[in-house]
Curated annotation (Swiss-Prot):
Function: Pole-localizer protein involved in the regulation of several cellular processes.
Protein name: Pole-localizer protein TmaR
InterPro entries (UniProt xref): DUF496, UPF0265
Coiled-coil region list: 14-41
One GO cellular component term: cytosol
Highest taxon of the lineage: Bacteria
UniProt entry keywords in alphabetical sequence: Coiled coil, Cytoplasm
Cytoplasm is among the record's keywords: yes
Compartment annotation: Cytoplasm
Record-stated family: Belongs to the pole-localizer TmaR family.
Organism: Escherichia fergusonii
Length: 111
């Protein structure tokens, strides 16, 4: 079987397409994040509407908002902690994979 060596133009086209694909992937993720954020805002307003009743005092409404804010801040803190734990696990796995790769490369070189 004969394999043809890719021309310089083919390589450039491959790189261009690969970069475009990555850019599109980043844009898609960005738009998905914006969609999620706006859906959360709509849900927040719905929740707030459920709590606020006609004739409530400004202080009562401010109390509800303060309580909701506190709940959301607690969730953010929990997510920050969870993210740190996941990042630590990912780093540990990366180190193990690197060591395994070095051992594998060392065995291949000695053969």
């Amino acid at each position: 079987m004969e394999t043809t060596k890719p021309s310089f133009q083919d390589v450039l086209e491959f790189v261009r397409l690969f970069r475009r694909k990555n850019k599109l992937q980043r844009e898609i993720q960005d738009v998905e994040k914006k969609i999620r954020d706006n859906q959360k805002r709509v849900l927040l307003l719905d929740n707030l509407s459920d709590y606020i009743k006609p004739g409530m005092s400004v202080e009562a409404i401010q109390g509800i908002i303060a309580s909701m804010k506190s709940d959301y801040e607690d969730r953010v803190d929990d997510y920050i902690i969870k993210n740190a734990e996941l990042s630590k696990e990912r780093r540990d796995i990366s180190k193990k994979l690197k060591v395994m790769g070095e051992i594998k490369n060392g065995e291949a070189k000695s053969e």
